[in-house]
């Protein structure tokens, strides 16, 4: 791994941790990197009171982080040392730091788990759905930033390219506004009869999607993207059909096609999969 890649990725991770702490008010944010032997190591942190967790190495399957890597899903516990969904080899380190509630989310780039994003508090309070959603949104944004770093390197973009990347990671609310705007633009393009204007609107939509999309082999049609954009807004099949001016059965057909292409089992898995490959923001 070259020095420039390490610096670029560390900057993106640091920005994510800072942004997450600001957005949630949670005192502790951490990132654990997946090592070559599938162990985790906490390599960056904000707000730790002691060195107990700093640079801590976590064996596969151990604790919250190990479970996240094993399941590839978010994990949250409100009382770490008593939680029955995780193993407890690292309880002493957690107790030394004084953490109680922890939420951890995987960071996945090109289907490979690159690390785990954590938040934690030093008191016995439950971290609610709003916090979990914010951590998840930040993880998704970090995934895209890491993917952009990788894409820029593959394309030989020279050093000193900071102007091409955001100086900070958007928080969940800001990112959701981008997604909502993208979906509404796609719906507007769908209703426009002027072909030139429609193409202009579709180009605007494309500009809101990360460069990862260019490298993907999975090809989604414009109509399939329209359906996904509706689903991303929370529309039912009937509402999507009304928005697009087509039948509900046609919407279902598009969704089945999308789910098959993306290997998704539900409509919301399809939306998340599309975001991972850069087909949706």
Curated annotation (Swiss-Prot):
Residue span, HTH luxR-type domain: 213-278
Lineage of source species: Bacteria, Bacillati, Actinomycetota, Actinomycetes, Mycobacteriales
Single GO MF descriptor: DNA binding
Matches recorded under NCBIfam families: transregRamA
Disruption phenotype: Cells lacking this gene grow on acetate with the same aconitase activity as cells on glucose. This mutant is unable to grow on acetate as the sole carbon and energy source and, in comparison to the wild-type, shows very low specific activities of phosphotransacetylase, acetate kinase, isocitrate lyase, and malate synthase, irrespective of the presence of acetate in the medium. The transcription level of the rpf2 gene is reduced 2.5-fold in the ramA deletion mutant during growth on glucose as the sole carbon source.
Alphabetical list of SMART domains matching this protein: GAF (SM00065), HTH_LUXR (SM00421)
Protein name, as recorded: HTH-type transcriptional activator RamA
Origin superkingdom: Bacteria
Role this protein plays: RamA is a master regulator of acetate metabolism. It positively controls the expression of acnA, aceA, aceB, ack, pta and ramB genes in the presence of acetate. RamA is also a positive regulator of rpf2 gene expression during growth on glucose as the sole carbon source.
Alphabetized UniProt keyword annotations: Activator, DNA-binding, Transcription, Transcription regulation
PROSITE patterns: HTH_LUXR_2 (PS50043)
Gene3D superfamilies in the cross-refs: 3.30.450.40, Winged helix-like DNA-binding domain superfamily/Winged helix DNA-binding domain
InterPro entries for this protein: GAF (IPR003018), GAF-like_dom_sf (IPR029016), HTH-type_RamA-like (IPR049651), Sig_transdc_resp-reg_C-effctor (IPR016032), Tscrpt_reg_LuxR_C (IPR000792), WH-like_DNA-bd_sf (IPR036388)
Record's note on what induces expression: RamA represses its own expression.
GO biological process: acetate metabolic process; regulation of DNA-templated transcription
Pfam families, A to Z: GAF (PF01590), GerE (PF00196)
CDD domains with a match to the protein in the record: LuxR_C_like
């Amino acid at each position: 791994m070259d020095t420039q890649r390490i610096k670029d990725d560390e900057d993106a991770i640091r920005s994510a941790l800072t942004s997450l702490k600001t957005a949630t008010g949670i005192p502790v944010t951490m990132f654990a990197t997946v090592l070559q032997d599938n162990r985790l190591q906490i390599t960056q942190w904000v707000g730790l009171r002691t060195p107990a967790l700093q640079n801590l190495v976590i064996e596969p399957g151990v604790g919250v982080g190990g479970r996240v890597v094993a399941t590839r899903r978010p994990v949250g516990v409100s009382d770490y040392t008593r939680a029955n969904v995780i193993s407890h080899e690292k309880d002493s380190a957690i107790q030394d730091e004084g953490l109680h509630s922890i939420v951890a989310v995987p960071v996945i780039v090109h289907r490979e788990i690159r690390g785990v994003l954590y938040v934690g508090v030093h008191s016995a309070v439950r971290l609610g759905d709003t916090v979990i959603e914010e951590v998840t949104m930040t993880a998704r944004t970090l995934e895209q930033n890491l993917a952009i770093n990788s894409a820029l390197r593959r394309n030989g973009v020279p050093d000193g390219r900071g102007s091409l990347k955001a100086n900070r990671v958007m928080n969940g609310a800001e990112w959701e506004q981008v997604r909502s705007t993208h979906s509404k633009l796609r719906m507007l393009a769908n209703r426009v009869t002027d072909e030139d204007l429609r193409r202009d609107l579709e180009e605007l939509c494309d500009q809101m999607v990360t460069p990862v999309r260019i490298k993907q082999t999975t090809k989604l049609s414009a109509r399939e993207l329209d359906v996904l954009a509706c689903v991303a807004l929370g529309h039912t099949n009937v509402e999507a059909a009304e928005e697009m001016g087509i039948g509900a059965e046609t919407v279902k057909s598009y969704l089945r096609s999308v789910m098959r292409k993306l290997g998704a089992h539900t409509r919301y898995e399809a939306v998340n999969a599309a975001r991972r490959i850069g087909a949706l923001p």
